[in-house]
């Protein structure tokens, strides 16, 4: 078997060169174990996954999700910076961009579920800071099942009348989704 690893400079960290594993080659292959011409089939794929991600270990990227009417982008930038200074590779979404490890990957309003999935699919990210706005939640949901930390900053009338949300109570119901899907700490 072999592991194929791509990098521009093998003497440097993969984080500096954007290197990474592109393929794991099992030898002599899995098919002979999964569908043998003789004998009992074996779930070797499951055994490989159990070795890579042992049962009971954390395989999910920790998520901090922020929502509110005002201050989401500022707070998400601040949290992303704190986490980066603590040594993490941060994936962040905001009304400005998707940012991975301090590098802008996509510009524009990236507060919806598609951008959240972009961050969570990036193999270099080890913590996510996701700004989640009313529009994305109403149109398409969150882009993640749960978060570890959720923050609902405020609910004010600034964005009423958009996307079928016409009252403060209605806006609060949309924003409280973040508190409801938080498995750890909720900041109100």
Describe each model-derived feature in a short phrase:
Residues 1-67:
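ATP-dependent carboxylate activation and anion-phosphoryl transfer catalytic cores
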Residues 22, 64, 91, 149-151, ...:
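Hydrophobic/aromatic beta-strand patches that form the interior of the parallel beta-sheet core
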């Amino acid at each position: 078997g072999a592991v194929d690893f791509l990098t521009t400079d093998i003497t440097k960290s993969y984080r500096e060169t954007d290197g990474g594993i592109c393929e794991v080659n099992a030898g002599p292959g899995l098919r002979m174990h999964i569908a043998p011409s003789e004998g009992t089939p074996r779930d070797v794929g499951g055994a490989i996954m159990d070795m890579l991600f042992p049962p009971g270990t954390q395989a999910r990227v920790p998520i901090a999700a922020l929502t509110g009417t005002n201050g989401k982008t500022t707070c998400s930038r601040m949290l992303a910076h704190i986490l980066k200074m603590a040594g993490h590779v941060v994936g962040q979404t905001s009304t400005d961009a998707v940012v991975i490890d301090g590098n802008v990957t996509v510009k524009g309003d990236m507060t919806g579920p598609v951008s959240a999935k972009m961050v969570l699919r990036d193999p270099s990210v080890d913590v996510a800071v996701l700004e989640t706005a009313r529009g994305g939640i109403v149109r398409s949901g969150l882009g993640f099942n749960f978060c570890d930390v959720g923050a609902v900053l405020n609910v004010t009338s600034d964005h009423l009348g958009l996307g079928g949300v016409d009252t403060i109570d209605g806006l609060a119901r949309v924003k409280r989704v973040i508190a409801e899907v938080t498995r750890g700490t909720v900041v109100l």
